[in-house]
Amino acid sequence: MKEAVKMSCLCIFLFLFLFSLTDAIKCIKCGESGLFGTEDCVTGNFEAEECGPNDQYCTKIILNDGTRTTAQRGCSVGHVPESNQKDGKVSTHMSSCNTDGCNAN
């Protein structure tokens, strides 16, 4: 009986361990090299990449200064409330989401 309980506990632990290995969110990551993002991140075709173990959200920041548009997309541990702001010619859009690849569009 003790062996059956030990085996059941081991199976449950193994299942939970394997499940946690595949639970990381995948996000589009680009534009992180520029202070305000990069132009190729706006329209580029990027594959979603696995984020860190603590990341729960994908983020997107779009900036338009009246002459060009740049973007930054990546992973985040916290939620970024959706925000659209305009100040003169400069407009920004920020948002986050929590499904794989959701920050692509």
UniProtKB/Swiss-Prot annotation:
Signal peptide: 1-24
GO cellular component, one term: extracellular region
Location of region: Disordered: 79-105
Stored InterPro entries: Snake_toxin-like_sf, Toxin/TOLIP
GO molecular function, one term: toxin activity
Further information: The scoloptoxin-05 family has remarkable similarities with the three-finger toxin family commonly found in snakes.
Membership in a protein family: Belongs to the scoloptoxin-05 family.
Protein name as it appears in the record: U-scoloptoxin(05)-Sa2a
